[in-house]
């Protein structure tokens, strides 16, 4: 189906290569057609998929970037886990139901010894409402817990008096210097006193 005979992965890689050397401002100004596909002829020669969403995500990532401890030569890893958080997705004549998926995202860097040098963790809870009449409603946008910041509303319920993003930051700081094997052995019952002093949310 591709006019340039390339698969999605190849085109996504081509777009990533095209961005190398650009500033965040230049990325944000990349022009696209109404369908999100690029206008630039050079980019079109290797990428014809819609790139507007990826463009905006890259620009946003640049705007949110901060120094967390990574160094030149570190390896970057991304982990994503999705779990069904819906108890029942059968709507009845008198009851609407919500279908929710909990998506956990962790990005980290590790040095040549495999020890974490920086990490950031986030979570999103996108949900659909299945109406009793069979229609399905979805929010226009879903904000992650980090994006919600203080408005997430966890501080009052936290034994540490912390908001969710602060718990996440505490957990990520705790990971620094640890290997994957050491992290995998972390107790899930909150019995690690050092971690419990920083973070009491579920980190499993």
Predicted regions and their residues:
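Active-site- and interface-proximal helix/loop "cap" or "latch" segments in soluble metabolic
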Residues: 1-204
């Amino acid at each position: 189906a591709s006019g340039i005979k390339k698969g999605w992965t190849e085109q996504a890689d081509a777009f990533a290569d095209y961005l190398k050397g650009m500033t965040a401002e230049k990325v944000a100004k990349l022009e696209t057609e109404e369908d999100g596909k690029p206008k630039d002829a050079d980019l079109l020669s290797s990428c014809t998929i819609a790139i507007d969403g990826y463009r905006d995500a890259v620009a946003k990532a640049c705007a949110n970037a901060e120094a967390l401890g990574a160094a030149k030569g570190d390896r970057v890893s991304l982990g994503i886990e999705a779990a069904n958080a819906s108890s029942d997705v059968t709507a009845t004549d008198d009851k609407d139901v919500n279908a929710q998926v909990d998506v956990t995202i962790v990005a980290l860097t590790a040095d040549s010894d495999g020890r974490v040098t920086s990490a950031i963790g986030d979570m999103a809870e996108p949900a659909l409402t299945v109406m009793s009449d069979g229609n399905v409603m979805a929010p226009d946008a879903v904000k992650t817990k980090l994006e919600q910041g203080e408005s997430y509303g966890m501080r009052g319920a936290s034994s540490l008096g912390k908001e969710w993003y602060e718990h996440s930051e505490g957990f990520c700081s705790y990971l620094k210097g640890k290997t994957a094997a050491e992290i995998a052995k972390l107790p899930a019952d909150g019995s690690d006193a050092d971690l419990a002093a920083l973070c009491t949310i579920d980190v499993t």
